[in-house]
UniProtKB/Swiss-Prot annotation:
Residues 190-210 form a coiled coil. Interacts with the Agrobacterium tumefaciens virulence protein F (VirF) in the nucleus. Binds to EIN2 C-terminal region in the presence of ethylene. One of its GO terms (cellular component) is nucleoplasm. It comes from the Eukaryota. It is found in: Nucleus; Nucleus, Nucleoplasm. InterPro entries: ASIL1/2-like, Myb_DNA-bind_4. It comes from Arabidopsis thaliana. Disruption phenotype: Reduced ethylene sensitivity. Residues 24-113 bind DNA. This is Trihelix transcription factor ENAP2. Gene3D superfamilies: Homeodomain-like (1.10.10.60). One of its GO terms (molecular function) is DNA binding. Residues 1-13, 130-141 have a biased composition (Polar residues). The gene is ENAP2.
Length: 248
């Protein structure tokens, strides 16, 4: 009785599916992302031209292509579009992504592109993720990416708890730092203006109280003077009346 030994999944994943000319291995995808990313940065994050895509395809074929399965510029472009869609899906997840190409695409097409003072995005070299047994994690296409993510599981999650921090130059050329500095300066100016306004209000209130006090004192003095004049007038009238009586 013959016994058959089941093939391991890793060995099968290296083989391109029959009839799949658009099949991409993990390593070919890594080379594609690096070649496309460099062109994308040199074009100041603009769209690649046809000649650029041909150069990207040449870079992939020089390392991973054979005569029967060379990648065309159109296949490279379609693959990058697929990777962008995959990135958006990973970006929308609440949990940290364990996808191999997430960090690199986040640097290239994420909401905030990290630039150095010279305006060049610093690229981080790709590293093969290791599973707990130490073997390289490989896959075929984006359909296999989800399977690979499940296989790696918590190991990659732990590995990504301490990712290598990219060096970001926060010099005068950093737009984020300039914006933060401008906001801080605006806050300081606003605080000084508000402080001066409060000081002016206090001074005006003091002046108003001084004027009110002075007016009140003048009014009381006038009333007292008027009262004295009235008393003097009454006194003169009494004296005059008593003098007339004595003369009779």
């Amino acid at each position: 009785m013959e016994t058959t030994t089941p093939q391991s999944k890793s060995s099968v994943s290296h083989r391109p599916p029959l009839g799949r000319e658009d099949w991409w291995s993990e390593e070919a995808t890594a080379t594609l992302v690096e070649a496309w990313g460099n062109r994308y940065v040199k074009l100041n994050h603009g769209n690649l031209r046809q000649n650029d895509w041909k150069d990207v395809a040449d870079a992939v074929n020089s390392r991973h292509g054979d005569n029967s399965r060379k990648k065309t510029d159109l296949q490279c472009k379609n693959r990058v579009d697929t990777l962008k869609k995959k990135y958006k899906t990973e970006k929308a997840k609440l949990s940290p992504s364990t996808w191999r190409f997430y960090n690199r695409l986040d640097v290239l097409i994420g909401p905030v592109v990290k630039k150095s003072a010279g305006g060049v995005v610093k690229s981080a070299p790709f590293k093969n993720h290791l599973n707990p047994t130490g073997s390289n994690s490989t896959g075929s296409s984006l359909e296999d990416d989800d399977e690979d993510d499940d296989e790696v599981g918590d190991w990659e999650f732990v590995a990504r708890k301490h990712p290598r921090v990219e060096e970001v130059d926060l010099s005068e050329g950093s737009t984020c730092r300039e914006l933060a500095t401008a906001i801080l300066k605006f806050g300081e100016v606003y605080e000084r203006i508000e402080g001066k306004k409060q000081q002016m209000m206090i001074e005006l209130e003091k002046q108003r109280m001084e004027v009110t006090k002075e007016v009140e004192l003048k009014r009381m003095n006038m009333l007292m003077e008027m009262q004295l004049e009235i008393e003097k007038s009454k006194h003169r009238k009494r004296a005059s009346a008593s003098g007339k009586k004595n003369s009779h």
